[in-house]
Amino acid sequence: MRQFQDKKVLVTGGSRGIGKSIARAFADQGARVAINYRSNAAAAADCLRELGGKGNIALQADIADPAQAAMLVEDAISGLGGLDIVVNNAGIYLWHPIATADFSDWIAAWRQTIDTNLLAAASICYCAAQHMMRHGGGRIVNVSSRGAFRGEPDGPAYGASKAGLNALSQSLAIALAPHNIFVGVVAPGFVETDMAAEWLEGERGDAIRAQSPLGRVARPEEVAHAVLFLASPGAEFTTGTIIDVNGASYLRS
Ligand code: NAP
């Protein structure tokens, strides 16, 4: 029996990068997965093909819009026939250094980042929790970032959005435990995906890899491994925890 046999899982931003690895790892363990994406339908179709099996679906929604986020949860529930696990993985990073960004760009970056990285997760947690509370419980895993702790000098809204996501997750861990809903967080450092490609392939690439004593950044599967652990049977008492997946590049205690 595979660990997530017949579990119904929604992964936001599940069409590429870390989300795709998370979707694949759940599918490999027997789950039925709904992958959400914003606009790249071709990547979502490729991902769905790679997942193989039956019953996986791709759902387009711009989750920065709360109405679309709510509809996404409804569509996932009806398309999968229920919802046991939600992974809030979709996120964006926008460059807006305070020394050079003009005020309107600064505000636009803050709004877009908070709407995508924090408000979307809050919307989806709300809608998913309503379903889970009526159906005996569930799991929520949120994908945060090392930047929440270490700071993001060129993308302060990103760091703030992920710190907010950590606080949201921990508040919900307390609020939802009596309803048998457990909430965990995974906080990666740099990961080999499109989001980080420009840095990793650029002149700072070697310095970034050297931040870890392993001399490299994370692979998406390594983040997925931590996500599946938090969603697995037996991990209930870890609720409220934040797992670092940063290769000891930033240590906190
Ligand atoms: P990625 O390769 O850029 O992929 C982003 C995914 O999110 C895509 O599927 C994208 O869909 C989707 N997405 C973005 N905005 C969306 C929206 N408004 N509505 C719905 N879907 C949306 O990103 P990644 O590197 O895998 O990152 C995944 C998560 O890990 C993010 O939360 C990120 O902050 C976090 N993280 C990443 C790193 C890193 O180094 N890569 C480090 C720490 C944390 P489309 O393709 O359709 O746009």
Predicted feature residues:
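Catalytic Tyr-X3-Lys loop
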Residues: 92, 103-122, 137, 141, ...
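Alpha-helical segment proximal to the catalytic Tyr-Lys
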Residues: 130, 174-175, 236
